[in-house]
Protein backbone atom coordinates (compact mmCIF):
# COMPACT_ATOMS: atom_id res chain seq x y z
CA UNK A 1 0.00 0.00 0.00
CA UNK A 2 1.32 3.46 -0.87
CA UNK A 3 1.62 6.39 1.52
CA UNK A 4 1.92 10.15 1.09
CA UNK A 5 4.21 11.98 3.51
CA UNK A 6 3.66 15.71 4.07
CA UNK A 7 6.17 17.94 5.80
CA UNK A 8 7.05 21.56 6.53
CA UNK A 9 10.64 22.71 6.91
CA UNK A 10 11.45 25.06 9.79
CA UNK A 11 11.68 27.94 7.28
CA UNK A 12 8.01 27.37 6.32
CA UNK A 13 8.50 25.61 2.96
CA UNK A 14 5.93 22.79 2.52
CA UNK A 15 6.49 19.66 0.44
CA UNK A 16 5.38 16.04 0.10
CA UNK A 17 6.49 12.72 -1.35
CA UNK A 18 5.05 9.24 -1.85
CA UNK A 19 6.37 5.98 -0.38
CA UNK A 20 5.85 2.50 -1.80
CA UNK A 21 5.08 0.82 1.54
CA UNK A 22 4.91 1.28 5.31
CA UNK A 23 8.54 0.23 5.84
CA UNK A 24 9.82 2.94 3.48
CA UNK A 25 7.47 5.47 5.11
CA UNK A 26 8.72 4.63 8.60
CA UNK A 27 12.40 4.79 7.59
CA UNK A 28 11.91 8.18 5.93
CA UNK A 29 10.00 9.61 8.90
CA UNK A 30 12.62 8.26 11.33
CA UNK A 31 15.37 9.96 9.31
CA UNK A 32 13.41 13.22 9.13
CA UNK A 33 12.84 13.24 12.91
CA UNK A 34 16.53 12.59 13.61
CA UNK A 35 17.56 15.54 11.41
CA UNK A 36 15.49 18.02 13.42
CA UNK A 37 14.91 20.29 10.40
CA UNK A 38 11.11 20.03 10.26
CA UNK A 39 8.24 21.58 12.19
CA UNK A 40 5.45 19.40 10.74
CA UNK A 41 5.41 15.79 9.52
CA UNK A 42 2.31 13.75 8.68
CA UNK A 43 1.32 10.84 6.47
CA UNK A 44 -1.76 9.25 4.98
CA UNK A 45 -2.54 6.05 3.16
CA UNK A 46 -3.19 6.07 -0.59
CA UNK A 47 -5.73 3.38 -1.47
CA UNK A 48 -5.70 1.40 -4.73
CA UNK A 49 -8.69 3.46 -5.91
CA UNK A 50 -6.55 6.60 -5.62
CA UNK A 51 -8.41 7.92 -2.58
CA UNK A 52 -6.49 9.24 0.41
CA UNK A 53 -7.12 8.09 3.98
CA UNK A 54 -7.08 10.05 7.23
CA UNK A 55 -3.96 12.13 7.85
CA UNK A 56 -1.90 11.07 10.87
CA UNK A 57 0.35 13.75 12.38
CA UNK A 58 3.78 12.61 13.59
CA UNK A 59 5.27 16.02 14.49
CA UNK A 60 3.55 19.38 14.96
CA UNK A 61 5.61 22.18 16.51
What is each model feature region?
Residues 23-33:
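Short, surface-exposed linear segments at secondary-structure transitions and domain or protein termini
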Residues 11-24:
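A short, exposed loop/beta-hairpin motif centered on an aromatic-Gly-Thr core
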Residues 1, 21-22, 46-47:
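Low-complexity, intrinsically disordered short segments enriched for Gly/Pro and polybasic residues
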Residues 18-19, 28, 38, 48:
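Helix-centric, low-specificity signal for extended rod-like, repetitive segments
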Residues 1-13:
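Short aromatic-glycine-(Arg/Gly/Cys) micro-motifs in beta-strand/loop hairpins
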Residues 33-61:
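Short, mixed-charge low-complexity intrinsically disordered segments
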